[in-house]
């Protein structure tokens, strides 16, 4: 069996926002790739890998994935944090990649084999107003999508208003548009009414609330959009208030997809066991990789909850590959969010996931089936890149009085 000889973090994309983990072994040419990307704290994740996890694993048998996962999980003593789980997730994916290459099989075959011929996916349609949104939805339908996420005016979906139209106090904080919950509660049902009038019931829609509402208003929104038969409403309530999903479930039949910010098993376990959600939406890398997510999927299957692993603009092709291999093998798969990578980004990742119409197709090569051209990865960084000057905090929204809106 292959022994781990080194673990390297390869930064790529503009400003180094992607971190690809490369686990090397003592077998000639045998290595694995994983995703440990964190657009807001990339260097912190790299430090965890290089200073804590890599020294733990060098010399260990790469085949013992579960034992290595538990070793990484417990060796920092404090656990269940986003940065640690991202670091673990990147290494875990790489170990599964190695195992697939050793076996000569795609990872989904190691997870039990194919449950489906391809992976249904959804894209992101948006616009500053309903006219632009309808135009974008038409484009996605023409591309073959049957499920589409719809946002109007950003994550606020019509809830952002110009400052000159808002009642702003003196010495107001911030300078951009402000988020108004009542405007949002009016705009979103109206948006879906117009979309259904335009497109009928032949296409399914999702919408991302991004935890911008108070729990009571989230329940109101879920009730108001019921007539429009959403595929799901995403992250209606912030993780700090997940107990409110009990009240939401009692009052609305709108399907709920939850978990983009989840990293701790205690955040999803009760929601799944009490059947308060319909889709679990953790990010594969943030939850601890393939090993963690196959356990989440098994728990979810027992309680009738489906998977909808989170992707999004800051995710990389390796994370998407890991998600799709899970999707192929999980019976209770629901839908997969798709990433729209630039041509030059795809060019750096040979074997990236292919999309045809509304379906994703994994590589049939051994492992995750994806390879990184390190020269092209370096070129994606751009000129003058320096990890020491990187600073990219999440851009927060505010209400009219200056109160921060929780993302």
Swiss-Prot record:
It holds the Pfam family MR_MLE_N. Mg(2+) binds at residues 208, 234, 260. InterPro entries: DgoD-like, Enolase-like_C_sf, Enolase-like_N, Enolase_C-like, Mandel_Rmase/mucon_lact_enz_CS, Mandelate_racemase_C, Mandelate_racemase_N_dom. Belongs to the mandelate racemase/muconate lactonizing enzyme family. GalD subfamily. PANTHER family: D-GALACTONATE DEHYDRATASE-RELATED, STARVATION-SENSING PROTEIN RSPA. Has no detectable activity with D-mannonate and with a panel of 70 other acid sugars (in vitro), in spite of the conservation of the residues that are expected to be important for catalytic activity and cofactor binding. May have evolved a divergent function. This is D-galactonate dehydratase family member Pjdr2_1176. It comes from Paenibacillus sp. (strain JDR-2).
């Amino acid at each position: 069996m292959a022994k781990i000889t080194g673990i390297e973090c390869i930064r790529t994309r503009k400003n180094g926002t992607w971190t690809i983990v490369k686990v090397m072994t003592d077998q000639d040419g045998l290595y694995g790739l994983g995703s440990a990307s964190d657009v807001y704290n990339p260097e912190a994740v790299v430090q965890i890998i290089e200073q804590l996890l890599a020294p733990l694993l060098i010399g260990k048998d790469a085949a013992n994935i579960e034992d290595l996962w538990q070793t990484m999980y417990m060796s920092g003593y404090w656990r269940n944090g986003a940065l640690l789980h991202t670091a673990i997730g990147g290494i875990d994916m790489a170990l599964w990649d190695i195992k697939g290459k050793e076996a000569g099989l795609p990872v989904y075959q190691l997870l039990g084999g194919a449950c489906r011929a391809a992976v249904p996916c959804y894209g992101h349609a948006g616009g500053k107003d309903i006219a632009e949104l309808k135009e974008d939805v038409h484009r996605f339908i023409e591309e073959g999508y049957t499920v589409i996420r719809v946002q109007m005016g950003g994550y606020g979906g019509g809830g952002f208003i110009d400052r000159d139209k808002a009642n702003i106090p003196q010495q107001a904080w911030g300078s951009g548009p402000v988020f108004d919950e009542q405007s949002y509660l009016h705009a979103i049902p109206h948006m879906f009414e117009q979309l259904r009038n335009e497109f009928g019931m032949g296409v399914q829609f999702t919408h991302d609330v991004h935890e911008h509402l108070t729990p009571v208003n989230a329940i109101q929104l879920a009730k108001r959009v019921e007539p429009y038969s959403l595929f799901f409403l995403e992250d209606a309530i912030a993780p700090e208030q997940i107990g409110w999903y009990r009240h939401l479930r009692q009052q609305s039949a709108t399907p709920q997809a939850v978990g983009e910010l989840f990293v701790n098993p205690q955040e999803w376990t009760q929601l799944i066991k009490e059947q308060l959600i319909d889709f679990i939406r953790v990010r594969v890398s943030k939850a601890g990789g393939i090993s963690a997510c196959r356990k989440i999927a098994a728990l979810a299957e027992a309680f009738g909850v489906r998977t909808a692993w989170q992707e999004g603009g800051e995710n990389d092709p390796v994370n998407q590959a890991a998600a799709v291999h899970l999707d192929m093998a999980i019976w209770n798969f629901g839908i997969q969010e798709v990433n729209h990578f630039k041509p030059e980004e795809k060019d750096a990742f040979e074997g990236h996931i292919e999309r045809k119409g509304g379906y994703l197709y994994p590589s049939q090569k051994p492992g995750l089936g994806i390879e990184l051209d390190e020269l092209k990865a370096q070129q994606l960084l751009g000129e003058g890149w320096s990890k020491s000057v990187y600073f990219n905090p999440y851009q927060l929204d505010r209400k009219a009085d200056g109160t921060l809106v929780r993302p």
